[in-house]
């Protein structure tokens, strides 16, 4: 966790308006600022990988393609395997991951795949390196680098994301193994505030992660997930998302992160999962686009939205709605369950069925990225809600 002395004062969260209605009051942290004498100009840090970082970001943001998130921890993967009666063994994880990445033609619709560390170093059941299979399909390999969440002392029962220790060495090793982008997922809970401390911690961690991974050749995906837990409406989600992203970009600037060599992975802005007020795709699309226009210019090549537990069809319809009018960014998907759920269910019917479903789900979201998805002919299985209340591990 970032120490209090490292957390800069923020023009966003130090505004008392943000603290209204919260049970926890966080005093402003006195940040040390150095003002050079005489005239000066801001120099944005650019590592020796700058050109490659920009190229990677643009490749991931190529038209009609998005990200397959298959970075579940071994424990979470075990829960998914258990749902179809399989044991959580390395052999079963290897077999399932092999099926996910080996669907013929998958690279037409998937530009990047986020891997768990085991997968990055794993071979397929045919003995080929997973990374090589992806590259042959034109899919950029990525890696999850955070180490999960722990309780955040002094907060409203909120969490902080660990993993900065040793990140530089790990990033360098992942690059050598073939990874070209990274993912760091931190979470913000609306029912618990969110407190100013939790938002500052999330933003600072994301910024430090981004700077470290860029220095080692990995394009950072920035994912401050606004959790779906709660009964709040969409306007409450929107207000919190604005505060979170403002704080994130403030800290990215403080850490001289090269935005052209990064990607954003925002939550779709919708009501809480327990809210009775569910909006149509057009409304769910309008709020995140409004947020992005207010908080981020077009310098970031790709906006890869996460599904956050929505059903496969709902997530695809919402993405399609976001692409009904021109955007200054590539707005696409970075889905895990929304791409995998039906594939997993069909595994018991045969391996080829998994590949077919994998291809079909990716194609549907490719159409949504192009604004051409209709939702016609989708199975009832793909329409099932997949919300699961957040825990401190994943």
Swiss-Prot record:
- Asked if the Swiss-Prot or TrEMBL record annotates the protein with the keyword Cytoplasm, the reply is no
Source organism phylogeny:
Eukaryota, Viridiplantae, Streptophyta, Embryophyta, Tracheophyta
Q: Does the keyword Transit peptide apply?
A: yes
UniProt keyword list:
Chloroplast, Glycolysis, Lyase, Plastid, Schiff base, Transit peptide
**Name of this protein:** Fructose-bisphosphate aldolase, chloroplastic
The protein's site described by Necessary for preference for fructose 1,6-bisphosphate over fructose 1-phosphate is found at 394
Positions of the catalytic residues: 223, 265
Q: Where along the chain is substrate bound?
A: 93, 183
- What EC designation does it have? 4.1.2.13
* Subcellular location per the Swiss-Prot or TrEMBL entry: Plastid, Chloroplast
Pathway in which the depicted protein is active: Carbohydrate degradation; glycolysis; D-glyceraldehyde 3-phosphate and glycerone phosphate from D-glucose: step 4/4
Q: Read off the Pfam families from this record.
A: Glycolytic
Principal cellular location given in the protein's record: plastid
Any one Gene Ontology BP term: glycolytic process
Organelle targeting peptide span: 1-46
To which species is this protein native?
Spinacia oleracea
Q: Which family does it belong to?
A: Belongs to the class I fructose-bisphosphate aldolase family.
GO cellular component terms, A-Z: chloroplast; cytosol; protein-containing complex
Recorded catalytic reaction(s): these are:
beta-D-fructose 1,6-bisphosphate = D-glyceraldehyde 3-phosphate + dihydroxyacetone phosphate
Domain of life assignment: Eukaryota
Q: What is an example of a GO molecular function annotated in this UniProt entry?
A: fructose-bisphosphate aldolase activity
Enumerate the PROSITE patterns for this protein: ALDOLASE_CLASS_I
